[in-house]
Amino acid sequence: MTAQHPSPSARFTGDANPYGGGDPYADYRTADFPFTQYANLADRQLGAGVIAANDEFFAQRENLLVAGRAEFDPEHFGHKGKIMDGWETRRRRGASAAHPWPTAEDHDWALVRLGAPGVVRGVVVDTAHFRGNYPQAVSVEGASVPGSPSPEELLAGDVKWMTLVPRTAVGGHAANGFEVSVEQRFTHLRVNQHPDGGIARLRVYGEAVPDPVWLAALGTFDVVALENGGRVEDASNLFYSPATNTIQPGRSRQMDDGWETRRRRDHGNDWIRYQLVARSEIRAIEIDTAYLKGNSAGWAAVSVKDGESGEWTEILPRTRLQPDTNHRFTLAAPVAGTHARVDIFPDGGISRLRLFGSLTEEGAARLTARYQELGG
């Protein structure tokens, strides 16, 4: 039996079958959600965290943001019962013997700090392996609170929470996806499960929107970095890993933490196209092939264009790359642009691309205007 992949508009409800042995993902329900083209703003690598939950009796809240898919061991039990790879709360009870059931308002919650504040385009509430102990429904709210607020500050009465996903029934052992159409910048989410139960993973897809005051204070920074508002627009091949890995923070940690393409059997080449945070002047380039040893790109070139209708201008000609090496290049003069493209020859991979520079006056003004429009 194989995992089920219905249309992107599918909504999963109801129990999954009890685990019957073999591959636990064989009857997992999922869909190809269009919003997953965006970056995961709740990525631990970006600095996201689950900072509080009202209950985590059976399984800890931090599991929600673990990078890999949830694991299941049918024989793994502890002193409190079955150990699950997710966030699981105790069973709610009513106030008395006459009313033993939870009320319609009863729910459990977890507070999530986004690693990169931004506009949320979609949320996946994954109940993998929670077959009969998943929540009846979930809801998701968002707030924009500057600085580094504590859980108590986020729960204060003066914090305005906006509904991103209304209370909606979900299914067990399924990727429950929700498109979000709220055009606002958020820093924190509150995930609610009604009335109780377990969630394996949470993914929050969207566009990072950085604070322009912070970028102005930095002066020179990586203008294509995900955390600074850069994003991948398209790529020629995503066979082994996502192109967004190339603009993640820090150095690659292992081979699959970069971007690797399938082997080419023609005379073409592979590429990634990026949108910069805003119009910027680029002064230096880094291309890192860390952990890519027998599968590193052989050569790379970098081009930029200024505006959607601009022409591509090569700023780094086709240059030989070494495996498992960080390559640094300085430009003879700053080059202004809004988009960038890296071409690798003939195939293979790179782990990171860095474009160091600063916002132009026009770019800073546009970023500030968008930040303010989004409620930043």
UniProtKB/Swiss-Prot annotation:
Its EC number is 3.5.3.4. The keyword Hydrolase applies. It catalyses: allantoate + H2O = (S)-ureidoglycolate + urea. It is an enzyme of class 3 (hydrolase). Disulfide bonds: none annotated. The keyword Hydrolase applies. It comes from the Bacteria. This is Probable allantoicase.
